[in-house]
């Protein structure tokens, strides 16, 4: 820098000694002023460069400290060193640019006439240099932050690895006892003759000759038994099953009930190992029909319909004791039929015959919904009280309807109940099925029906 100043001074003296005009002096003064500004700028740049070199020196010290503290993280330190090398390269670029600036000043010695233009160019380059130096400062701050963060991460990783190594050192199995074998990181059980692992990887005894009565069930060894004759009690003892232990008592019972001698007309016939008990009878008078012993010739006893009945004790015929009034009952499924709806409901109907009429008394019952028409069916083939035949319910006439009745009902729709009535009439009896036609009445929308007790009757001789 001092050489540059001396050179400029010599040039100024040379110009002065040549007797330039006042205008030249003015230009020289301007040049001096610009040179002073350039000198001030160069000094400021030098100070900035010195500051950067100081920061680089501090950074080198910190990098050295990091290298000594985290030697095991060489890869990351290498990256930091490459970053520092990049910074050094940037500083070398700055030195190169400063050398270029010196070269340009040397050119200014030879081209003093173009000093204004060179000075402007120098100011522009100096401004760019300041920008680059500021960028370098920012990069150094980012690098410092990154180094600090990476160092903390490295310390945390080292601490975690140290904890895991401590755990491994504590839990690691280095030797095994008798019956075990350690191969690398695996521990095996030494299995001798007479032992094996089942499909659940459980060590078991190996019995090669289980036919002798021993075997395994789950994880236990048991005695093999024939469960048809033997079982285990609550104490694990082998006991006889009931079908075996009860044989003596059953044998004694059979022996006690054995018939050795029979009286006529019975006789015992033996054929080989078979003993047959036979009934002796006179074939002229008796015959076995459908495994039943009957007379070959007998009088046919007539059958009687109500109100007549046969007293088998003395073979006498008399008026039935329930003539004029006879009680009974039928229980079964009340069927409802329409082309689009069909359901069954269990009901119990009390039967009462008065003279030549059969009265059906229905108790209170509930059913599913009905339509405005349809028919109800009672099947008297089954469900009648003892003494009541299916034919005793057959009507004595085929007039349709045989009779009608008004049935009080309630139509139910959710919580709503509507009182109503239906007109029912006995229409037909066919092979024990009595049809009751639904002729109409009041009607409303509903889901279920409650039927009040009702009676319906029709002519019937029984």
UniProtKB/Swiss-Prot annotation:
GO biological process: cell adhesion; symbiont entry into host cell; virion attachment to host cell
Post-translational modification (record): Undergoes dramatic conformational rearrangements during viral disassembly in the endocytic pathway.
Region (Tail): 1-317
Entry keyword annotation includes Coiled coil: yes
Entry-linked Gene3D superfamilies: 1.10.287.1490, reovirus attachment protein sigma1, domain 1, Virus attachment protein , globular domain
Record note on quaternary structure: Homotrimer. Interacts (via the head region) with human F11R.
Protein name: Outer capsid protein sigma-1
